[in-house]
Amino acid sequence: MAHKKAGGSSRNGRDSESKRLGVKKFGGEAVLAGNIIVRQRGTKWHPGANVGLGKDHTIFATTNGSVSFRTKANGRTYVSVDPIAEAAE
């Protein structure tokens, strides 16, 4: 009798875990100092005023305010935080 042995399992069925990259706070949203604004690989968005750049290129707020995205003449998009004028107590 002609029989064919089992061929083994498929070589597919693996995938990497998603990294949850992207914009976390959009333009006009209020942020607190330390809030993450963008998670990225490389500098798709560049740091502007009142933001910091982490070693993994994460852009985060250094002051309280609202997020703004601006594209300059060089074609780069800069992320800034416009500080809110706090009322004197």
From Swiss-Prot:
UniProt GO MF annotations: structural constituent of ribosome
- Keyword Ribonucleoprotein listed? The answer is yes
Q: Where is region (Disordered) located?
A: 1-21
Q: Name one GO biological process term.
A: translation
Q: Name one Pfam family in it.
A: Ribosomal_L27
Q: Which family does it belong to?
A: Belongs to the bacterial ribosomal protein bL27 family.
Q: What is this protein called?
A: Large ribosomal subunit protein bL27
